[in-house]
């Protein structure tokens, strides 16, 4: 007898319990702070990690100055505020409502385009752009090369960056996706015909934003797609993306050949009205490209790509997505929905990486990008997939060559095919590499990839792996301020400030639990060793002793501001 129904009921009950008792998450020794903009409506959230004093002074009798707190980018909104009252039935505060209404009155008078790209091209710095500049800098006014609102505007105007902010999703806190900004991470959630419920997907949304998701895609293919998306949007502080062809397929009872432009158009309008911030559109899958996949090991692995390929073959013509692309752009322009041009022919195995089908589609995506820009629609380009390490840079080079600087957004890529259950690791290797080469956003992969629908714990594992990859890429790019947290951690580690080490970690709970498995006593939180080396073999403790023995080896242990270092 199958246990699936009972497991599904249990998962739903657990999710309902989580949401009914939902309160802001407490990060150890952290506080939620705000940076004010030029008007009172611009309040940029961030998390401040407070640090303790240095316990073991390098020079007897000489007290070092206090360790400054570390400010970090925060996507958790009220879900990271222990003092917040949260009601998922009421939804989040509409932080952008006033900005949208003010612009609506102006646009009615002058008949201007309403997208962030349209404003940027007119030389207008929107509140969203100012918000983003403050957010990227984390209030570090002393940076050598800080991000300015004008820089944000110029990057958007050039098409090198996008601000996905549907005017019908006022709950979202503005963020930017572009190669000259912090590398962002997307988390995929969504139900299937086999598993999950609305409650579970909202739970995953909350969980993903707590662990740092910059955007979330609702890839629901099961029941209640509209209702699931509505709950997600009203409770999401981050941009929400979708693949509209999934809901369109549901409308025609799963028969790809019965899809049509009228059906798809209705879905686009419905989702845009709800507030979806970006659409993945697989308009680059052309009829002639399908035969290029015939000799692939894994064929067409994109769900949207395979659906459109089947439609093209059945009707022996180009897809309605390609034929009606300008109509799609007109809808997006009305709501400021960004386009994520899907890589329907991405490689699904190492053997298929960088093949003719993949790059043929990429060139078409570059052509579609220019068409979208004619309508002031913001665009990013989706990328692979499964790519071995030595072929990753070619993907970035080809995207820059053919897509006119539009941001690149990749799924990994996975660097080997041999590790089911660990594909969050195989893929974050490739993600870190392509992020360092200039990829703007990384789509996370969970341990369940190729195996099943991710649960809440899988979402966490995927997010942690990809926040590591994104941060490593930011360090490699020399992003202003990126190294501040690393240097604070290194200093805490050298000074045996264990509590600070836990609190500075991406996952403080796990860091603490690993330490406490062998040294749980409070006294061990000030000890000059851990269980790896013990008191006699700790290299850092010995290094302190060397400095005491030989004054010439003493150095100023005050860490230089890594924010300035990263900008040089």
UniProtKB/Swiss-Prot annotation:
One of its GO terms (cellular component) is cytosol. GO terms for molecular function: 4 iron, 4 sulfur cluster binding; carbon-carbon lyase activity; zinc ion binding. Signal peptide: none annotated. The keyword 4Fe-4S applies. One of its GO terms (biological process) is thiamine diphosphate biosynthetic process. Zn(2+) binds at residues 386, 450. Keywords: 4Fe-4S, Iron, Iron-sulfur, Lyase, Metal-binding, S-adenosyl-L-methionine, Thiamine biosynthesis, Zinc. [4Fe-4S] cluster binds at residues 530, 533, 538. It comes from the Bacteria. Its cofactor is [4Fe-4S] cluster. Pfam families: ThiC-associated (PF13667), ThiC_Rad_SAM (PF01964). Substrate binds at residues 188, 217, 246, 282, 302-304, 343-346, 382, 409. PANTHER family: PHOSPHOMETHYLPYRIMIDINE SYNTHASE, CHLOROPLASTIC (PTHR30557:SF1), THIAMINE BIOSYNTHESIS PROTEIN THIC (PTHR30557). Belongs to the ThiC family. Homodimer. This is Phosphomethylpyrimidine synthase. It comes from Idiomarina loihiensis (strain ATCC BAA-735 / DSM 15497 / L2-TR). The gene is thiC.
């Amino acid at each position: 007898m199958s246990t699936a129904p009972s497991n599904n009921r249990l998962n739903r009950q657990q999710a309902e319990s989580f949401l009914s008792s939902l309160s802001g998450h407490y990060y150890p020794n952290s506080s939620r702070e705000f940076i004010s903009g030029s008007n009172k409506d611009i309040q940029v959230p961030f998390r401040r990690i407070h640090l303790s004093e240095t316990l073991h002074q390098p020079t007897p009798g000489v007290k070092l100055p206090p360790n400054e707190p570390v400010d970090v980018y925060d996507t958790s909104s009220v879900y990271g505020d222990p003092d917040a009252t949260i009601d998922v039935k009421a939804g989040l505060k509409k932080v952008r409502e006033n900005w949208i209404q003010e612009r609506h009155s102006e646009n009615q008078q002058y008949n201007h385009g309403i997208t962030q790209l349209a404003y940027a091209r007119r030389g207008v710095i929107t509140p969203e752009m100012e918000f983003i500049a403050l957010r990227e800098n984390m209030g570090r006014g002393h940076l050598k090369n800080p991000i300015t609102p004008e820089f944000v505007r110029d990057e958007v105007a050039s098409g090198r960056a996008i601000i996905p902010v549907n005017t019908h999703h006022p709950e979202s806190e503005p963020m930017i996706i572009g190669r000259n900004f912090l590398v962002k991470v997307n988390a995929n959630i969504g139900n299937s015909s086999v598993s999950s419920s609305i409650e579970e997907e909202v739970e995953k949304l909350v969980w993903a934003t707590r662990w740092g998701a910059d955007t979330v895609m609702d890839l629901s293919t099961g029941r209640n797609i509209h209702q699931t998306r509505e709950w997600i949007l009203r409770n999401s502080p981050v941009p929400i993306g979708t693949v509209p062809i999934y809901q369109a397929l549901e409308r025609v009872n799963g028969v790809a050949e019965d899809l049509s432009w009228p059906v798809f158009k209705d879905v686009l309008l419905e989702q845009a009205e709800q507030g979806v911030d970006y659409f993945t559109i697989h308009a680059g899958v052309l009829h002639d490209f399908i035969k290029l996949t015939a000799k692939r090991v894994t064929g067409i692995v994109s769900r949207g790509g395979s659906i459109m390929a089947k439609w093209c073959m059945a009707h022996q013509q180009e897809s309605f997505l390609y034929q009606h692309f300008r109509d799609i752009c007109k809808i997006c322009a009305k709501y400021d929905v960004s386009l994520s041009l899907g890589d329907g022919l991405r490689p699904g195995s190492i053997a298929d990486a960088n093949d003719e089908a993949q790059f043929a589609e990429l060139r078409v995506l570059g052509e579609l990008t220019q068409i979208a820009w004619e309508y002031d629609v913001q665009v990013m380009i989706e990328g692979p997939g499964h790519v071995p390490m030595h072929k990753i840079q070619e993907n970035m080079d080809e995207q820059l060559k053919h897509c006119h600087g539009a941001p690149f957004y990749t799924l990994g890529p996975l660097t080997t095919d041999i590790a089911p259950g660990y594909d969050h690791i195989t893929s974050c290797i490739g993600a870190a590499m392509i992020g360092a080469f200039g990829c703007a956003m990384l789509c996370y992969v969970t341990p369940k990839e190729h195996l099943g629908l991710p649960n809440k714990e899988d979402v966490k594992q995927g997010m942690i792996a990809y926040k590591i990859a994104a941060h490593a890429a930011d360090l490699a790019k020399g992003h202003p301020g990126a190294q501040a947290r690393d240097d604070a951690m290194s200093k805490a580690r050298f000074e045996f400030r264990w509590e600070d080490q836990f609190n500075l970690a991406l996952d403080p709970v796990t860091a603490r639990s690993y330490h406490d498995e062998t040294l749980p006593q409070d006294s061990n939180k000030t000890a000059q060793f851990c269980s790896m080396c013990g008191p006699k073999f700790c290299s850092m403790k010995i290094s302190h002793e060397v400095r005491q023995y030989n004054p010439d080896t003493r150095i100023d242990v005050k860490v230089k501001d890594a924010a300035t270092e990263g900008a040089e």
